[in-house]
Amino acid sequence: MAKLNLAFYTSIARNMNMLLVRGYDRNGQRIQEKIRYRPTFYLEAKDSSKAKFKGLDGTPVEPMVFDSMSDSRKFVETYKDVPSFKIYGNDRHIPAFIYSQFPLSIQYQQSLIRICTLDIEIRKEAWGYSDAFEAKNPIIAITVKCSTDNTCHTWGLKPYDPSIALTSRYTIDYRQFKTEGQMLEDFLRWWIHPDNSPDIITGWNTRAFDIPYLINRLIKLGGEEASRVLSPWNIIESKEVKLKGRMQTMYELVGIQQLDYMDL
C-alpha cells in the first residue's frame, strides 16, 4: 500500500476492515484518516529461483495480498490445521501496518502532541457520592489544561473569583452556566473542535473515575450518542477490569490515548 504523508502516529485502532489513524504530517499538521488496510502474507514460492523474499527459516516465499483484514483471517482459519501449508507474515495487522509506514525508526515531535489533563468535580448530595458507573451526582465543574498552550479551560456552575486563584501561571478561560446540561453541551462543542481534540488524556484516577463518570453522566442526560463524541471517531469501547478487588467498567476513547497518573 502507498505510504501516508505521516511523520508519526499518536493512535492506530482497528474498526472492522478499516484502520483508524491519527498523527501528524511532516508539516506539523494533524492527520486523521480511515485506511482500508490490505494485509500481505507470504507463501512458499512455486518457483524458488524467482523468489524475491525469504522466510526467517530461509524458505523462498512470495507475497499474497488480501483485499481485507477479515479475508486474511478467514484464510488463516482455513489452513490452520494443515501442517504442510505454512503461512509466513504478521497476522497482527496494526504492527504490520506500522512497519509498512515506518520501516526504520519513528521521529516523534513531542511539542506537537496535545496532552490534556482532565479533572471533573461533582456535587455532593445529602446521601453522599455515587460511583462512576451510576453517575447520579451532577457534574459541577470540568477543567482541561493542554500541553500545547498556557490556558486552563474551565466550565462551571458557580461564579469564578480570580482573587482567590492559587497560581497566576496560567491564563484562565472560565465559562459559567446556569445548568449542567448547558455546561456539558458547551464543553462538548469545545472538545470536538479539531484545534482542541486531545491526542492523550492524563490526570489522577481519570481511567477509573473522570472518564467513566463523564461518559455515564452524558449517557444519562443525552444518550449514548452524546457520549460518543468524546472519541474523535465517535467510538467508545468498554472493558471490565479488576480494580481494588472488584470488577469495574473502563472505557477507551478510540483515537485518544489515556495515561492515568495512578498507572505511571
PLM regions with names:
Residues 1-264:
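The two-metal-ion catalytic cores of nucleic-acid processing enzymes
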